[in-house]
């Protein structure tokens, strides 16, 4: 058998394996995309419609987010917040480390941050009044630019990006701070 014929046979026997590997790779990518899409869709309405109990205190189910308010909140967030907090809510790098002026960089509003650790009323107040001078907060207040309802709408958009655990915890804090157990 000639050298050229051996090379031709080797290529022919490798072709099915390459097709199989390529097909499996494509299947894996499609599977990952489907899982990601499902998780993203579930995050937007990540509620169980069950009462939330933490530390023995039960509050009503997490309120469902209104898709129209979430869309409006995204528009407002993009206009007023994204320049500092990031288009994907990611915040600034090293947001936990003080800057030379003593302030902190803008924190993320996604699940990696601490926004979901605070009740709604406190978050709206921070948005309205700006960063706390006691912490060298440099975030401007938006009370002149936005109504309280617009600030709450932005918060609805932010919440739409959290998972069910963050939503439930933040709702529990909000409800208990309002005396709703």
Regions found by a protein language model. Give the residues of each.
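Electrostatic cytochrome c docking/interface patches
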Residues: 46-76, 168
């Amino acid at each position: 058998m000639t050298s050229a014929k051996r090379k031709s046979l080797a290529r022919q026997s490798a072709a099915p394996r390459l097709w199989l590997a390529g097909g499996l790779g494509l299947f894996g990518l499609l599977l990952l995309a489907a899982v990601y899409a499902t998780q993203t869709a579930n995050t937007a309405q990540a509620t169980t419609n069950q009462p939330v109990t933490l530390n023995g205190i039960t509050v009503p189910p997490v309120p469902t987010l209104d898709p129209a308010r979430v869309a409006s909140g995204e528009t407002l967030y993009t206009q007023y917040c994204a320049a500092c907090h990031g288009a994907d809510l990611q915040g600034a790098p090293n947001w936990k480390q003080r800057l030379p002026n003593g302030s902190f960089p803008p924190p993320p509003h996604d699940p990696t941050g601490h926004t979901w650790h605070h009740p709604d009323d406190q978050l709206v107040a921070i948005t309205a009044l700006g960063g706390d001078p006691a912490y060298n907060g440099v975030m401007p207040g938006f009370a002149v630019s936005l109504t309280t309802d617009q600030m709450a709408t932005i918060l609805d958009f932010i919440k739409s990006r959290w998972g069910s655990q963050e939503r439930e915890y933040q709702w529990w804090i909000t409800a208990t701070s309002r005396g709703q157990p």
